[in-house]
Amino acid sequence: MLDIQLFRKDIDAVAQRLATRGFQLDVAAFQALEAERKQLQTQTEELQARRNSLSKQIGMLKGKGEDASAVMAEVGGIGDTLKASAARLDEIQAHLGELMLSIPNLPHESVPVGNDETQNVEVRRVGEPRQFDFAVRDHVDVGEKLGLDFDTAVKVTGSRFSMLRGGMARLHRALVQLMLDTHTQEHGYTEMYVPYIVNAASMRGTGQLPKFEEDLFKVPRKVGSEEGERIENFYLIPTAEVPLTNIVRDAIVAGDKLPLRFVAHTPCFRSEAGSYGKDTRGMIRQHQFDKVELVQVVPADQSFDALEQLTGHAEAILKKLELPFRTIVLCTGDMGFGSTKTYDLEVWIPAQNTYREISSCSNMGDFQARRMQARMRTGQGKPELVHTLNGSGLAVGRTLVAILENYQNADGSVTVPAALQPYMGGTTRLEPEL
């Protein structure tokens, strides 16, 4: 959530920056709410001053033994007006709060201005795509002979799910172990095991609610209280960013404890409500997929350096796996809702003859921290909002896809990348099942 003082100071400048990311701020609606809020607050202050003055008069009149009923009646009337004003002011504040929750983050000045993904800017490429001397097969054709099973997953659950068997399942696990070991042992992250179901407050804190509710899997639950039963909504996590970042919700962290670096391996659950017809074949776009997530909590003046660092941590996994990739900076029109700057890592997918996203690394600035009231304190100073960052380190399923395609052999086998062989008991190749 953005600082409302930015809007009160120069709403036109804010609207212009938001427009670069395709968001049209309803300036008139905001200004109308603000005008009424100011009018109500002024009226309330004047009425409170009048009531205080009259209350003193009542005391003086009673002290003299004089009739104070008229003044008391006026005080009673002021009280009724104040109650009505307070109720309306609460409504105005609620409307302003809802409006602020619906507004995305401001792009950083270093972000290229653009309308969509076609205007993202490539920063660097690492590795050269392999030249095959045989017809390249996609990960579905390669994987189904090695233990990648879509048919059983469809029977058990439905479309956009998959099962892994034998060597494929082991390769998937090896990827997770490599990622966690690298991030904890080389990059200084603390490994966390987190809930896969979170409450609505956590989803609001990181920005999934209220805007993206249709993309989430909701878990309604009956909760009992003295007033009776009510339904409380919980949610399957779309990313470990949600529970990891909410660790600091409603907390004041000592400045000397920062930066905090968390990593977690979790399944992620997404309804893909807006993805009908996209990537219907294979593992690229699933309702359930595994991801190793990186989260950092840092002081405000360190967040952009931390973004470069975090992006490098994700890149390190691709380098270890010797997978060709490129890093791009997203333009204003392609950034996520809460991000002020984002780098995407895209891995080479031979069968598609293109690069596909495998990690997104974002600096959220104080956008999430303001929603969560996540703060830091240095010495005896006043609490200040922290900055939060997150990134995939990496999406496990898409990394598996990249390995199946880039390391495939003419006989249908897949060479196990050298970095994974210690996690595979020395296995160097996955052979087609008999």
From Swiss-Prot:
Q: What is its main location?
A: cytoplasm
**What residues bind L-serine, as annotated?**
239-241, 293, 392
Q: Which UniProt keywords apply?
A: Aminoacyl-tRNA synthetase, ATP-binding, Cytoplasm, Ligase, Nucleotide-binding, Protein biosynthesis
Top-tier EC class: ligase
Give the EC number(s) under which this enzyme is classified. 6.1.1.11
Question: Domain of life of the organism in this record?
Answer: Bacteria
Biological role: Catalyzes the attachment of serine to tRNA(Ser). Is also able to aminoacylate tRNA(Sec) with serine, to form the misacylated tRNA L-seryl-tRNA(Sec), which will be further converted into selenocysteinyl-tRNA(Sec).
Assembly and oligomerization:
Homodimer. The tRNA molecule binds across the dimer.
- Family of this protein: Belongs to the class-II aminoacyl-tRNA synthetase family. Type-1 seryl-tRNA synthetase subfamily.
Q: Any idea what this protein is called?
A: Serine--tRNA ligase
Name its species. Cupriavidus taiwanensis (strain DSM 17343 / BCRC 17206 / CCUG 44338 / CIP 107171 / LMG 19424 / R1) (Ralstonia taiwanensis (strain LMG 19424))
